[in-house]
Design a protein with these regions (language model features):
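Pair of pore-lining "gating" transmembrane helices in MFS-fold secondary transporters
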Residues: 24-47, 126
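Hydrophobic core of transmembrane alpha-helices in multi-pass small-molecule transporters
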Residues: 38, 118-134
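Residue-level signature of mid-helix packing/kink "hotspots" within the transmembrane helices
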Residues: 74-82, 167
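Helix-to-loop junctions at the C-terminal end of transmembrane segments
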Residues: 80-92
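Primarily marks hydrophobic transmembrane alpha-helices of the MFS/SLC 12-helix fold
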Residues: 94-97
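C-terminal ends and interior cores of transmembrane alpha-helices
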Residues: 102-115
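Intracellular juxtamembrane helix-capping segments at the cytosolic ends
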Residues: 133-147
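Glycine-rich segments within core transmembrane alpha-helices of 12-TM secondary carriers
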Residues: 150-170
């Protein structure tokens, strides 16, 4: 019984294990990445699709029409990200994170007021660009730059935010 406890203690609390050493000393930055990953959900397909029935009913759209508008918004946001992604080379992580968080909040607020097809396309564009695009880009770039030897482990920990979001969001 005692040897099992000592194994558990040495495995989880020892700083000799590189994975747990990373968590112990870098928990703040990893939490940042995990939360950014979680909050990117507001622009992810799994989250937006939860409301597609109500959106289609409100705007009298077929599945195909909604899918076409969604594809247009996604494609245009991806093209915009090619240009906007350069900001991660010139802006600080803190500044870009704050701007991205504010843009996700404003995009969500705008999306809640959608009353026409044009507003829908623009709202989807904003959500896809700020949430799915920039939010993911900002945290993954920051984590990739910060860690050399533990890059994969750090990205895996931060990526758990998406899994957490899929499990807990409506």
């Amino acid at each position: 019984m005692n040897s099992g406890y000592s194994f558990f203690k040495s495995f989880f609390y020892s700083t000799k294990n590189p994975f747990f050493k990373l968590i112990k000393f870098e928990w703040r930055f990893l939490l940042y990445g995990l939360l950014m990953s979680l909050w990117s959900s507001f622009g992810q397909t799994f989250f937006i699709s939860l409301f597609s029935l109500e959106i289609r009913q409100e705007l009298d759209l077929s599945h195909g029409e909604f899918g076409a508008y969604y594809s247009i918004a996604t494609t245009v946001s991806a093209l915009t990200l090619l240009w906007l992604g350069k900001l991660s080379d010139t802006q600080t992580v803190h500044r870009l994170s704050v701007i991205t968080l504010i843009s996700v909040c404003l995009s969500s607020l705008f999306f809640s007021t959608v009353s026409s097809v044009l507003m829908l396309i623009f709202g989807l564009y904003l959500l896809r660009l700020s949430g799915q695009g920039m939010m993911y880009h900002v945290y993954s770039t920051a984590v990739t730059r910060r860690y050399n030897l533990m890059r994969g482990k750090a990205l895996a920990i931060c990526g758990l935010g998406m899994n957490l979001a899929e499990a807990t969001l409506p």
